Amino acid sequence: MSIQIPRGTQDILPGTVELWQYIEGQAREICRRYNYKEIRTPIFEHTELFLRGVGDTTDIVQKEMYSFQDRGERSLTLRPEGTAPVVRSYVENKMFGDATQPTKLYYIGQMFRYERPQAGRYRQFVQFGIEAIGSNDPAIDAEVIALAVEFYRGMGLKNIKVVLNSLGDAASRQAHRDALIAHFEPRIGEFCSDCQSRLEKNPLRILDCKKDRNHELMGTAPSITEYLNEDSAVYYDKVQELLTMMDVPFEKDPNLVRGLDYYQHTVFEIMSEAEGFGAITTLSGGGRYNGLVQEIGGPEMPGIGFAMSIERLIMALKAENIELPLEHSIDCYVVALGEKAKDHAAKVAFDLRKAGLSVEKDYLDRKMKAQFKSADRLKAKFVAVLGEDELDKGIINLKDMATGEQEEVALDVFASYVAEKLI
């Protein structure tokens, strides 16, 4: 019996990897333009980090984490999200002492959640995320959202929308929390067991419930906008004003809460409106987390960030029929004819690669026709033919596969000649 891939994971094969590499390259490029620096954290962390950083009332912590005991009886967890590890690194490495605040970081990496696999949702998945830590300026909120929107636009997506809300500061959240408890408590028995347990711990999460979203009490629940104090309302208005100035359209949704406990003030999601995208329309989401650095052991430092699923981005690209400019060709294929030419062909391929070109050659002693077929499949720009006649003359026959033109090139200058033609 053959061993198969675990459920909820996928192999990304040659031919598809190039798409991922292109997306990751574009992510790095936009982060360069916004002056975000890459950070790489461990794939596993101490479980306590996520209990404190994500929140013990969240679905992630209660149902979805891959946790295990190591041989030293330490509880470790494969990271289910990227913000808490980045903040842990920020605190542990004392980045808050850097004079150039805010600290602007990005990551591209694999995350792990035990969820029911479906289209766009895997148990191992890749996130691109950014974190800006150290500023309470609404301009950084707008910048984070604008970066995400510009990235999607740069990928060619047109059918996207930004959904925006504010959860307010700690005082606003507490006032809203009390109102939600008073609203739901008399009829909480009509809700699912998850919502019943959330009532006292984090009633805001009831608004995020998928099972009870059509319950009549959901439509009449107190809105956070009714409980924003003056400072929170001014902050929210400023974020909206800046987004409008940046030509970033958005919709306000007072029921948007996000699934993590650390959010305050700005929260947002970016969704696909493309036909055929599927039921899960959220491409990315994020928000402000002003208490998280302190919760993880650092000084009182505000922060904001977002994370996006690369898998869902690829779904959106397919839904909008977007073809990205991927490079699937090689520069040169070396055809060797006869035993005498084989070793020399290996040297020619080596010299071409040394000159910076992508090169392939035959390793199966096939006839010339079969070797040319391989060159076609690999979309070679040039084919170099080396046989005994060419060796005797000290030349190589070079064919331009786009024009069909052929020429003879001296063997001792061949690599530099082909390199010049391709530059």
Swiss-Prot record:
<dbReference type="GO" id="GO:0006427">
    <property type="term" value="P:histidyl-tRNA aminoacylation"/>
</dbReference>
<dbReference type="GO" id="GO:0005737">
    <property type="term" value="C:cytoplasm"/>
</dbReference>
<dbReference type="InterPro" id="IPR036621">
    <property type="entry name" value="Anticodon-bd_dom_sf"/>
</dbReference>
<dbReference type="GO" id="GO:0140096">
    <property type="term" value="F:catalytic activity, acting on a protein"/>
</dbReference>
<comment type="subunit">
    <text>Homodimer.</text>
</comment>
<dbReference type="InterPro" id="IPR006195">
    <property type="entry name" value="aa-tRNA-synth_II"/>
</dbReference>
<dbReference type="Pfam" id="PF13393">
    <property type="entry name" value="tRNA-synt_His"/>
</dbReference>
<dbReference type="InterPro" id="IPR045864">
    <property type="entry name" value="aa-tRNA-synth_II/BPL/LPL"/>
</dbReference>
<dbReference type="GO" id="GO:0004821">
    <property type="term" value="F:histidine-tRNA ligase activity"/>
</dbReference>
<keyword id="KW-0436">Ligase</keyword>
<protein>
    <recommendedName>
        <fullName>Histidine--tRNA ligase 2</fullName>
        <ecNumber>6.1.1.21</ecNumber>
    </recommendedName>
</protein>
<dbReference type="InterPro" id="IPR004154">
    <property type="entry name" value="Anticodon-bd"/>
</dbReference>
<dbReference type="InterPro" id="IPR015807">
    <property type="entry name" value="His-tRNA-ligase"/>
</dbReference>
<comment type="similarity">
    <text>Belongs to the class-II aminoacyl-tRNA synthetase family.</text>
</comment>
<keyword id="KW-0963">Cytoplasm</keyword>
<dbReference type="GO" id="GO:0016740">
    <property type="term" value="F:transferase activity"/>
</dbReference>
<keyword id="KW-0030">Aminoacyl-tRNA synthetase</keyword>
<keyword id="KW-0067">ATP-binding</keyword>
<dbReference type="InterPro" id="IPR041715">
    <property type="entry name" value="HisRS-like_core"/>
</dbReference>
<dbReference type="InterPro" id="IPR033656">
    <property type="entry name" value="HisRS_anticodon"/>
</dbReference>
<dbReference type="Pfam" id="PF03129">
    <property type="entry name" value="HGTP_anticodon"/>
</dbReference>
<keyword id="KW-0648">Protein biosynthesis</keyword>
<dbReference type="InterPro" id="IPR004516">
    <property type="entry name" value="HisRS/HisZ"/>
</dbReference>
<keyword id="KW-0547">Nucleotide-binding</keyword>
<dbReference type="GO" id="GO:0005524">
    <property type="term" value="F:ATP binding"/>
</dbReference>
